[in-house]
Amino acid sequence: MDRLELIRRNVQEIVTEEELEGLLKNKEAPRAYVGYEPSGKIHMGHVLTVNKLIDLQKAGFKITVLLADVHAYLNKKGTLEEVRKIADYNRRCFIALGLDEEQTDFVYGSDFQLGAEYMLNVLKLSRAVTLNRAKRSMDEVGRAMDDPTVSQMVYPLMQAIDIALLEVDVAVGGIDQRKIHMLARENLKSLGFETPICIHTPILLGLDGTKMASSKDNFISIDDTGEDIYRKFKKAFCKIGDVEENPILALFRYHIFPRYETVVIERPEKFGGDITYHSYAEMESNFIEEKVHPMDLKNAAAKYINEILDPVRKVLL
């Protein structure tokens, strides 16, 4: 797989591919970043962007991970001291998930976001962005509020300035970050900064085929036990022959096949014996043709996800 194929793998959108191709031609070691608001519950949605960072490292990129403690503070997730401790925990988890520590710069927001240069650029951007545009860039929870705080309006402006002052070529995030990334693309040039290329990953559904929600117990947290994962997978939505909005197949596509050259589905001989797959497309085709049973996929997915999460569990012990 060449550099461009690695970068394109499992992404929903690149803005723009032409700019990306030019970057790869002109810069030997470009820099990409993701910002993570420190979270006590890292789930497989977070891991999807970690997987993309690993792909980018293999493609020769230097990686910056912003541990956005100030953003978390503005979002009322705790005191700066509390969210800094969670950020330290997140850093250890991301390394355990496979990020190359030697090739990754971990930056805390509080290390640069409280300085005069940063705040001056946020103020400059605030003069250029309308209130309606800032509100459109807020996260879904903030947009749904009748009376959001000013800090929640400032949040997307800060994300744009993060991209500028971290001096990255590429901003990576879930497709839910698109509005913020487009705000950066539209405005940073006028402030004297480069326009970032943006790579967006899909948003994964919960195990029941609906939106992930902690109240539904329908997502995989990286601190779930092996027993938790087998229990959750057993009741996961995986309609036979149906590949649309199938969370089990999504785990194979986005998390398992990128980390394993071959995937083995273990089955008793009376049900046809083990099947070895060398690509996700091969597995999907067999599933559509009903040559492999949903429960066999669930058991295999649980086994591989547990293997992926084992290094993280050692960090947590």
Curated annotation (Swiss-Prot):
Pfam families: tRNA-synt_1b. Keywords: Aminoacyl-tRNA synthetase, ATP-binding, Cytoplasm, Ligase, Nucleotide-binding, Protein biosynthesis. Its EC number is 6.1.1.1. SUPFAM superfamilies: Nucleotidylyl transferase. It is found in: Cytoplasm. One of its GO terms (molecular function) is ATP binding. A motif ('KMSKS' region) lies at residues 211-215. A motif ('HIGH' region) lies at residues 38-46. PANTHER family: TYROSINE--TRNA LIGASE, CYTOPLASMIC (PTHR46264:SF4), TYROSINE-TRNA LIGASE (PTHR46264). This is Tyrosine--tRNA ligase. It comes from Methanosarcina acetivorans (strain ATCC 35395 / DSM 2834 / JCM 12185 / C2A).
